[in-house]
């Protein structure tokens, strides 16, 4: 027979477990409510899978640098409409072959794919309160909650018009013992303040998806995000460099950013531990 002290311990444990279940239920309810309605065709779902490293046809060295845009896809395995935003992003990528990189930012603690606390910090930074949402080139004014390739491309084109030429960006990386060491170098073509970001993503992640399937294949899943200090008062022609370490593994990918005044100026891609040089327009 349990003593009074033991009964108290058991009762305390039961209360703790009940509170834990209640907290999980509340988080799940918040997640469900946050998943906004869409006007998409319910059958308009993406082909599951990741995004291969896109290599442009390299132009002559010394010309304008090849320009890419970035889309942050704020998503969740719990969100019934989130696969529709993924489909919209893939359609936008198809219309701008090799020009758009995507990072899937899984959010909320109920999502086992969420990188915490980074995903929550990113959602707060861009004012994300509904899912799915997308942000182009880290520009808060580009936040959308409608799964539309046309809207995504309109923001991408608007921001590209503001940078007719973009900085060149190259990556030199190595991977050992689960640690990625990446050296980023950029040659800027406009005056301004610049910064780097190193992002690690993973493709082919199998996890249940509401609105998808129990064995849904997720791509571009955010695994690490590192930001450099700001390089102030840069002049056109300056070369900037930054070396950083992050956790990574074989098969993951690097999405590197060079940002001007906080907005993406250019994007470079390569496998984790790999390297890629400056790329040029044809």
Model-derived segments and spans:
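Local sequence-structure signature of Cys/Sec-based thiol-disulfide redox active-site neighborhoods
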Residues: 60-100, 105
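Secreted/processed peptides and extracellular or luminal domains of membrane proteins
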Residues: 41, 85-88, 276
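N-terminal secretory signal peptides that target proteins for export/translocation
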Residues: 1-19
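Bacterial Sec-dependent N-terminal signal peptides
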Residues: 15, 19-69, 282
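Sequence contexts marking disulfide-bonded cysteines in secreted/extracellular proteins
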Residues: 36, 80-83, 271
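Membrane engagement elements in two modes
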Residues: 45-48, 54, 84, 91, ...
């Amino acid at each position: 027979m349990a003593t009074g002290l033991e009964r108290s311990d058991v009762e305390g444990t039961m209360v703790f477990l009940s509170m834990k279940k209640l907290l999980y239920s509340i988080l799940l309810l918040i997640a469900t409510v946050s998943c906004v309605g869409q006007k998409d065709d319910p059958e308009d779902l993406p082909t599951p899978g990741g995004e291969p490293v896109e290599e442009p046809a390299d132009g002559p060295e010394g010309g304008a640098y090849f320009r890419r845009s970035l889309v942050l896809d704020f998503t969740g395995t719990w969100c019934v409409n989130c696969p529709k935003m993924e489909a919209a992003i893939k359609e936008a990528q198809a219309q701008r072959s090799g020009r758009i990189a995507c990072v899937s930012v899984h959010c909320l603690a109920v999502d086992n794919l969420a990188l915490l606390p980074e995903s929550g910090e990113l959602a707060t930074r861009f004012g994300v309160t509904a899912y799915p949402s997308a942000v182009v080139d880290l520009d808060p004014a580009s936040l959308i909650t409608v799964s539309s390739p046309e809207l995504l491309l309109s923001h991408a084109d608007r921001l590209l018009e503001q940078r007719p030429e973009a900085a060149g960006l190259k990556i030199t990386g190595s991977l050992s013992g689960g640690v990625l060491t990446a050296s980023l170098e950029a040659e800027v073509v406009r005056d301004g303040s610049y910064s780097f970001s190193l992002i690690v993503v993973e493709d082919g992640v199998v996890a249940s998806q509401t609105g998808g399937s129990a064995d849904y294949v997720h791509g571009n899943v955010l695994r690490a995000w590192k930001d450099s200090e700001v390089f102030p008062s840069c002049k056109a022609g300056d070369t900037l460099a930054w070396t950083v370490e992050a956790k990574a593994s074989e098969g993951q990918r690097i999405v590197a950013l060079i940002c001007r005044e906080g907005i993406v100026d250019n994007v470079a891609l390569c496998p984790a531990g790999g390297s890629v040089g400056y790329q040029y327009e044809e």
